[in-house]
Every structure is written in C-alpha cells, then in structure tokens.
Amino acid sequence: MKGGLVPLGKKKKEVTIEIIGGNAEGVTGSCTRIDFYGRTILFELGMVQDNSTILGNYKDNCAILNRIKPKKIEMVILGHNHCDHIGLVPMLFARGNTDVKIITPKDTTCILREMWSDTAFINERDTEALNRKGDKCYTPLYTQAEVEMALKNVIEIEVGSIIDIDENVAIRYTPAGHILRSCQTELYINGGSHTRKILFTSDLSNRMIEDRKVFVEKFQPVTSANIVIGESTYGKRKGSMKKKDIELDRQKMKTVIEQFCIDNKHRVLIPTFSLDRMPFIIWELYQLFGKDESFTVPVLIDSPLANRLLDCYSSILDGETKDKFNEMMSWKNIHRIITPEDSKAAISDKGAKIICASSGMLCAGRSVKWIQSILPNENDCCLFVGYAGIDTLAGKIKHGTGQKTININGKPYKNKCCLVDLHSYSSHMQHDDLVKYYKSINCEKVYLVHGDEQARIELKEDLEKALGDCCKSTRVVIVNKGTKISL
C-alpha cells in the first residue's frame, strides 16, 4: 500500500464513514459503512438481537439492510464471528447482491458456515411462527441457499501482515483476543499520494481472563491510526471486574456444583453461548474437576450448534492448544447430546448432572427446554455465566427473583430454583483496560461505539482525562445514530 498516513483535514475529504447498525447506540447489530472514491464497503454486518419480540428483531434487521442499499456493497470485512457481527451477511445475497466479497481472518470459514446455517434455520422457523399469527406474509431474512452463496465468496487472509485487497484497499488483521481467531482490523484506504488508516477494534479481549482462555489467541495492541472506532461495552466505571472477582466466581462455580450435584444429587443448568463461551466453560469445569477420579457427575453439552463448533475448533487448533482441547474433550464425564430425542431423554432424567446448553440468554435453543424443567424445582440450580438483555428470558429470570411465576412461551412456570449469577466470565475488555489501550494509540480521534449511553459517557470522560494527563490531543467522540465521519 503506497503513500504515508495523512493527517485529517489536510486533504480533500473523500472518505465517509457511518455507523449504521445497532452498535451506534447499543451492543448488537454491528455495521459500519465506508464510502470512498465512488465505492461502498462494510465493516461487519451483524444481527440486532436486542428486541424482546421476534417481530421486533425482524423489523430491526430489515431496517439495517434498507439503510445500506445492498446491491451497492462491494465488500464486507469481518472482525470476528459472533452473530451480532456477521449474522446478516447472507441477507445481501437474498437482496440480489451475488458479487460481494467477504473478507475474514484465516481459518474462520468453518465457523462462519455453522453460524450462518444455524441463523438461517432460526430465521425460517421464526418467520413460520410470524405467518401463523397474522395476515401479513413474512419471508426469512435468508435461507440456507443464500448461506451457500455467501460461503463461495469468502476470502480468508493471513493475520499479522498488510494484505492488498485491491488498488484502494488493504487490511491488516491483529489478534483481538475476544474469541478464537477474532481480530482488530486496520483498514488502509489508498488515495494515490496518501493513505488513510482506520482501526476497527470489533470486540476486544478481557485481559483479566485471557490466560484462562487457552483456545484463544492473546490480544495484541495496535499502535497508530488516523482514527479508531472502538468498542465500549464495559465502559462503565462501576461493575468493572477486578482480579479477585475472577477467582471468587471460579470458586463459587465449584461450590455450587459440589452442593447441588454431589451432595444433593440434583441438576445445575449453565445456559451458555455456543461460540467461545461453551468451550471456555467446559475447560473451566475440566480444570475444576477433571483430575478428580471420584467426580462422576455427567457434563452434558446439549446444543447441536455448539457440538458442530467444537468440531470446528478441533480442525482449527494446532500444537499445544490442540493437545489441551483433545485432553478436555476426552474427559470421561463429557456427554455430547445431538438428537432431539436424546435431549428429551436427558431432560426427563432428574439425576445429578451439569447441563451446558445454548443459548446463554435463553432466547432459543435447548436451554429453553431445560429451564422449563429446572425453574420449578427448588432442588435444582441455574448458573448464569454471561450478559443477558433485560427483555430476554434470562434477563427476566435474573431480575424476577421475587416473582412466583415466570412466563415461558406464554405458559407460567413456578419460579423456585436456585439462581446464581457470575459476572467475571465476560470476554469483553473492561473499563480500565479500555482507557489504557485507547490512550496508548497514536491517533487523532477515538469514536466510541458498541456500548450503552452511560458506558460511552463514562469511558469518554475517563479517557479524555487520561489523554490530558499524558499531554495527548486525541479527541474522543461518542457515536450516535446518524453520526458521519469524514476523512
């Protein structure tokens, strides 16, 4: 990529950036449009998952596609493979754009296939449910046919080197440490005599637990850019975890399992996301109990998607990391539940067991069936290990401890099981580390996205103070819907 980085305002402003997805003011539906020299590309195209209704999410996701004019998109650059960052990409093909290039870090196509295929299945099921309820006919956002079309256009590129995509665009992926193969993206836009560099952080590693996430590459910092478009998920000062919280939560998990599964011979449900969180929790359980020959409690992995993704991990990992993964998956206590019949049989068996089932927010998947069995039983426990939106079923259960019943799919269930909520398993960078990292980058502006309003306000205040203390003139900007950035 020819040309040196040019300071903002010194050349004709030919590059325009607009955060048009849900990440402008929230934490799902990440999508950024970059217009330059008559061309349009996207950084990520994720699904909105904030709405409490199927129809609400459907409309929100259609609205994103309507804003970007799908047939004009030449390229989508992906940072990592969580659905809220990649889930709408096949919808471009459903809207008639069959030529769009999809750029992704090396070794991630297997994960993309599973995530998109699962989403297509859910899309079709949800639209069938909507069509049964009303007179209007809804079509799926996309189907498996569009998934297959999208996969043919995926281009994997190496991590760590600047790769020329075409005469105007180059990319360097740098490990973000958030999940397996997740990357920050340094996007170079070449204008001939000069080059502009934009750093998209996507989601960043929780530095406090990265030594325990043995299947994920370690975070590496980027040192410079013209501008940074950075996440702020945990930008709030209050609630940012400390090292001691992590070990306390780990011991709490151990105590809960010993009490409910070993002493009382009952069940512990751990609702968890299929990608990244599932192998992390299985590894934690293996570290806690795997060497104890007297520990005979079955550990069920009840999620078709999670089981397929574990197979992807097996094909992607290598060296010492692959050895650790194989050791974990060879643990005699692990039982992989695949078929619906086996899942139903496991649910009907009230004996001692640990159940790791997706999804983590109890929005879909087999965890919903499990919670229907667990929730009314005061001898069982539901152990939450991740964030849950307040309007999701998991959020309603977390915040409904005083309620006698919880409605699940329109039916009331007694609210009697023990609830334990662990907060230190987040894979996102925490407030203090966000300030430290963004302060270290030599750039002209930092634009804060992917966080609620209060998180962005508090992070902006503290980052500005830290920048001032080290005599840096970097500006910090809170992005809102409609914010346009010119370079």
Predicted feature locations:
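His/Asp/Glu-rich metal-coordinating catalytic cores
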Residues: 9-77, 82, 86, 91-280, ...
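Short acidic, glycine/proline-enriched helix-loop-strand junctions
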Residues: 455-482
